[in-house]
């Protein structure tokens, strides 16, 4: 399993680098050797934009093959032209790459602990939205919006009637990778999420080295802090598929925005626009947070007295033009095809997703005290040692906030005000979610989105703290003790955060995986239910666990028309699930008890407590 997962990551990393290297080198050459850090993230953004534009016409697996021809050719040309300078920062690129793959493997610990590739985390949108959508897209293009799909499955209905909220991107990358590499979808879901989250290391590394002009060791410390952030493991376990793909793009887009405004580079600004242009179609809320943070960055440039405001015109125009062009199709779907109204009307999303019904306290937000201790669906008791060390964990949380504030102050005094401003703008948006909207889930998600930047500013304060102290006349003689103090604080935080992340990973293992081996064994149903048949799952008293099982049944029966009657529990999980259709209009009925009419039992699954019945009459009365 480990070798297979690592091989998948290497393939994805190589492909995305080929896809994004040429554009990155062409537009952001002024960033020197550090631009190579962004190549795979730029490649991911290009791929997502390709899905947004093309999957209404072709099956998703065609998109990467179409894109790799022009963008791969461009990468080849740019490598040939700039091969001497491409690896000028080879140490940063190498260590960031190793950190990315290490983080990827650490995130997949919950999958490896299951002993087989499956949906390893909490059962939610992974089984009800993303996997069914990807399964439909294995051999179909996106269905037309708001039209009854020709093949009526859980995935096709979702894509047709709510897919405009994620135009072109829901399930596309899973379907494409599955078709090309021949991996089953249930084995790909968590690795793709882990890979996207791990790519954030490269994005934030660029921000630290170029945006903050910090040292190599500051970038290493930032990566370690991010790799031990419990909210990243929480994101993976919850199966937040769109966010996992969008997070590295979000970070890279902001890093490029700050760099472009500072350097006055229209090319880097255009690249920032292209990268950010993938966000509205990928995950609209993160596009909103991006806009808020980028606006803060621009205001910091414009408002500062010494700024040459004329230098901002070209990069701003380039960024806006590139962003609008890249996101045009997504914006059309969000506005004209009512995708935005779906986001605005999703009032029930405030209690269901993420299991967040209350605001996390500051010690949990800092990451040093395990959030798994209070996360409502699977709250776990603190261990004996954790209970004894709780005062130290609280102290570490206080140090996190202190270092974060010092890091922001240092950035401001070192002339890195736009970089500090984007973080402050994000914090203001989180405050708005908490105090004005009173939305615990939205607030917690903003904390997740800002985790990479929080890691950067904490590391920026802790590493080489003595250099900053030396610039303060009253305490300049204490620079060496300040360095030692900063490193000691960093070690304490890393140990506490690593413990919290370990507890978060263990929390997911308390619950069975979303798809157990028995659930995956339901694929045997395909042997008795031919393709093209119509199937009704009849289980009106379905509990939440049984709804997940119904999702597994649907996954086991691709290319069959699929309808569910499951009562009112978690209403909206399946289309009109509380309306019983006429059973005799279906070729097969699956359920715990016999349906009405001339159905005969053809198969039983005692382990899953499901029976398969086939219509035996010639007409439906």
Predicted region positions:
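Transmembrane alpha-helical segments
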Residues: 229-230, 282-286, 330, 461-462, ...
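Hydrophobic, aromatic-rich transmembrane alpha-helices
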Residues: 208, 298-305, 317, 321-325, ...
């Amino acid at each position: 399993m480990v070798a297979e997962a690592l091989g998948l990551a290497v393939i994805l990393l190589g492909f995305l680098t080929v896809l994004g290297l040429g554009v990155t080198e062409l537009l952001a050459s002024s960033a020197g050797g550090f631009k190579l850090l962004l190549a795979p993230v730029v490649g991911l953004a290009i791929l997502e934009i390709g899905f947004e534009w093309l999957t209404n016409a072709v099956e998703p697996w065609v998109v990467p093959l179409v894109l790799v021809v022009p963008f791969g050719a461009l990468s080849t040309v740019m490598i040939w032209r700039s091969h001497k300078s491409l690896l000028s920062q080879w140490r940063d690129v190498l260590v960031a790459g190793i950190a990315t793959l290490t983080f990827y493997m650490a995130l997949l610990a919950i999958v490896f602990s299951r002993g087989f590739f499956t949906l390893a985390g909490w059962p939610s949108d992974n089984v009800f939205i993303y996997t069914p959508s990807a399964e439909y897209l294995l051999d179909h293009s996106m269905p037309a919006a708001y039209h009854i799909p020709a093949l009526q499955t859980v995935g096709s209905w979702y894509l047709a009637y709510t897919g405009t909220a994620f135009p072109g991107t829901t399930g596309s990358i899973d379907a494409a990778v599955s078709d090309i590499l021949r991996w089953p979808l249930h084995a790909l879901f968590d690795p793709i999420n882990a890979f996207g989250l791990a790519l954030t290391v490269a994005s934030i590394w660029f921000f630290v080295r170029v945006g903050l002009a910090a040292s190599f060791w500051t970038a290493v410390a930032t990566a370690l802090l991010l790799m031990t952030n419990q909210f990243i493991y929480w994101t993976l376990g919850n199966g937040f598929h769109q966010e996992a793909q969008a997070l590295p793009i979000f970070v890279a887009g902001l890093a490029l925005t700050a760099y472009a405004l500072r350097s006055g580079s229209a090319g880097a600004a255009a690249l920032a626009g292209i990268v950010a242009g993938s966000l509205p179609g990928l995950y609209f809320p993160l596009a909103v947070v991006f806009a808020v943070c980028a606006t803060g960055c621009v205001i910091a440039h414009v408002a500062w007295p010494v700024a040459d405001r004329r230098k901002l015109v070209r990069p701003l125009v380039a960024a806006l033009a590139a962003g609008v062009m890249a996101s045009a199709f997504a914006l059309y779907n969000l506005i004209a095809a009512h995708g935005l109204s779906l986001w605005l009307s999703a009032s029930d999303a405030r209690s269901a997703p993420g299991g967040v019904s209350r605001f996390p306290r500051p010690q949990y937000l800092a990451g040093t005290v395990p959030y798994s201790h209070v996360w409502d669906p699977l709250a776990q008791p603190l261990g004996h040692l954790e209970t004894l060390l709780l005062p130290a964990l609280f102290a570490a949380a206080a140090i996190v906030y202190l270092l974060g504030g010092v890091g922001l102050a240092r950035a401001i005094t070192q002339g890195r005000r736009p970089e500090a401003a984007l973080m402050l703008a994000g914090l203001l948006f989180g405050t708005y979610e908490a105090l004005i909207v009173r939305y615990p889930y939205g607030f917690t998600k903003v904390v997740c989105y800002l985790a990479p930047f929080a890691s950067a500013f904490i590391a920026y304060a802790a590493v080489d703290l003595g250099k900053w102290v030396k610039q303060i006349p009253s305490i300049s003689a204490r620079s060496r003790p300040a360095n030692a103090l900063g490193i000691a604080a960093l070690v304490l935080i890393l140990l506490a955060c690593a413990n919290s992340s370990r507890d978060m990973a263990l929390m997911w293992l308390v619950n069975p995986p979303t798809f157990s081996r028995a659930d995956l064994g339901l694929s045997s149903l395909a042997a008795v239910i031919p393709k093209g048949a119509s199937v009704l799952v009849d289980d009106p008293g379905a509990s939440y666990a049984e709804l997940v099982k119904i999702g597994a049944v649907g996954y086991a029966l691709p290319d069959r028309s699929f309808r569910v009657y499951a009562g009112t529990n978690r209403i909206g999980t399946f289309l009109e699930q509380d309306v019983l259709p006429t059973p005799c209009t279906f070729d097969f009925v699956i359920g715990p008890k016999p349906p009405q009419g001339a159905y005969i039992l053809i198969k039983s699954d005692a382990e899953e407590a499901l029976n398969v019945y086939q219509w035996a009459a010639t007409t439906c009365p």
